Amino acid sequence: MKKVLLTVCAIALFGSQAAWADARQDLQQRLNKVNSFQANFSQTVTSNEGALIQKGEGHLKVQRPDLFNWQMTAPDESTLISDGKTLWFYNPFVEQVTATWLESATTNTPFMLIARNDSKEWQNYDVKQNGDRFELTPKTENNLKHFSITVSPNGQIQQFAATEQDGQVSQYQLTAQKVAPIDASAFRFTPPAGVTVDDQR
């Protein structure tokens, strides 16, 4: 009886691993169909009890694997740009720019996963699929508890959401998406005159 139970458990485990691998592969293949896109986004942040913390909006441009321009326009302005090597974060309200190496940037955020679409990074997650919706759970504990993303078969991202360990949820809905090459100037950044530059490279 014990041997039968162990066999059943092993089959269930291997079956789950195969399903995770298939879902992970399908997600990557879908994302690989679109290498360059731009879209508007709306952001909703809620607490673990469902209370609204913040609503925001902005515009993003992505050119995989490592180029992106994320501009938050409301409620406060901020800009996050990757030129492929350096990650620039500009907060005009405090007149400060922070520069870090992209390769050392945290990978446990939804946007970094989407922008890079690196197979090695996806291996750090168990992935379940329900139609066009993919649910990701980190294999090792970090500040990200759960991540979901909805991607159409043609590779267009419709929405993504991240749940942190404290239960806070950040949801992003993409609209007015355009799939087309993006001018390289969108991924270049020069700190404005007079701002403080915190260079952590």
Swiss-Prot record:
Keywords: Chaperone, Periplasm, Protein transport, Signal, Transport
Localization of this protein: Periplasm
Keyword Zinc: no
Family annotation (InterPro entries): LolA/LolB/LppX (IPR029046), OM_lipoprot_carrier_LolA-like (IPR004564), OM_lipoprot_carrier_LolA_Pbac (IPR018323)
GO cellular component: outer membrane-bounded periplasmic space
Residues in the signal sequence: 1-21
Function, in words: Participates in the translocation of lipoproteins from the inner membrane to the outer membrane. Only forms a complex with a lipoprotein if the residue after the N-terminal Cys is not an aspartate (The Asp acts as a targeting signal to indicate that the lipoprotein should stay in the inner membrane).
Subunit structure: Monomer.
Family from the record: Belongs to the LolA family.
The protein's name in its UniProt record: Outer-membrane lipoprotein carrier protein
Annotated organism of origin: Proteus mirabilis (strain HI4320)
